[in-house]
Design a protein with these regions (language model features):
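Helix-loop junctions and terminal segments of transmembrane helices
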Residues: 8, 12-37, 106-109
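C-terminal transmembrane helix end/exit motif
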Residues: 22, 28, 101-106, 114, ...
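Interfacial segments at transmembrane-helix termini and the short loops linking adjacent helices
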Residues: 47, 65-95, 141
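Membrane-interface helix-loop junctions in multi-pass transport and translocation proteins
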Residues: 1, 68-69, 73, 111, ...
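Membrane-water interface segments that mark the loop-to-transmembrane alpha-helix transition
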Residues: 38-61, 119
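Interfacial/gating helices of multi-pass transporter permease domains
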Residues: 1-13, 80-83, 143-145
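Residue-level recognition of transmembrane alpha-helices
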Residues: 6-9, 53, 89, 93, ...
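Membrane-interface junctions at transmembrane-helix termini in multi-pass inner-membrane proteins
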Residues: 91-119
């Protein structure tokens, strides 16, 4: 199981690398637009990055669904079916990409990064409470389900907190 997890994690690192340059490219612009209170351009950046991230994720998920088995068979092995694990991992990366946008292009630029410790601590609690059950019930797939659950909870909290901050910024 550890070997399968490691292979899937290595393959998902390729997807993670597709996301990072976008965050780096737009971070300074988002900080600038926030500081100058140029809400139209700030929102445009957030929406465009969000669209690109979703497109990358949907493309990866679709590719994995239709030809993942063949590609994995050519480069890794035909003996192990990694497609299901990769599908959950890719979906998890889509959820994480939303959190990345919230953190790097919204929460940190507006100076509210201190809230992240609390969010991640809560995520760790959720993980500790669910991991053992999920792993025992679903095996290796349970590990991926547990990570998906934790990332979804963290992302939903970030979206909610970002909305609250946004509402307060607009009022001022």
């Amino acid at each position: 199981a550890l070997g399968i997890y490691t292979i899937v994690e290595r393959l998902l690192n390729i997807l993670k690398q597709a996301y990072l340059p976008l965050i780096q490219a737009f971070y300074s612009k988002s900080c600038f637009f926030y500081e100058t209170r140029d809400w139209a351009n700030y929102a445009k950046i957030l929406i465009n990055v969000f669209k690109i991230y979703i497109l990358i994720g949907v493309f990866s998920l679709t590719t994995n669904y239709f030809i993942g088995e063949e590609i994995i068979g050519i480069f890794i092995t035909k003996d192990i079916n990694l497609v299901d694990y990769l599908s959950i991992g890719i979906f998890n990366q889509i959820i994480i990409s939303i959190a990345m946008i919230m953190v790097n292009l919204y929460i940190i630029p507006i100076g509210k990064g201190r809230v992240l410790k609390k969010i991640y601590f809560f995520g760790m609690i959720v993980f500790l409470l669910t991991f053992n059950y999920m792993q025992r019930s679903y095996g290796l797939m349970g590990v991926f389900y547990s990570m998906l659950l934790v990332e979804t909870v963290i992302t939903l909290i970030m979206v909610y907190i970002s909305y609250v901050y946004y509402r307060n910024i607009i009022k001022n």
